[in-house]
A protein has these predicted regions:
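Short, charged recognition helix plus adjacent turn
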Residues: 13, 50, 60-64
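DNA major-groove recognition helix of helix-turn-helix/homeodomain DNA-binding modules
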Residues: 43-58
């Protein structure tokens, strides 16, 4: 699944570890999501969007 999570996270100055802790997953899970190797659940997508203060569209559907 292609997404903007890494771009948005880095722009916000947040590490994978910090984001993972905020949403209740491992750093490895965040890495897999960013690479497109893991399809997160809707609830995890929402948690990531809230943590990064972005919409689901901005993170997962409007890929730049």
């Amino acid at each position: 699944m292609e997404n903007n999570v890494k771009f948005v996270r880095m722009k916000a100055g947040v590490t994978q570890e910090q984001l993972a802790k905020n949403v209740g997953v491992t750093r490895q899970t965040i890495g897999l999501i960013e690479k497109g190797d893991y399809n997160p659940t809707l609830s995890l997508c929402i948690a990531i969007a809230k943590a990064l203060e972005k919409t689901l569209d901005e993170l997962f559907w409007e890929v730049e």
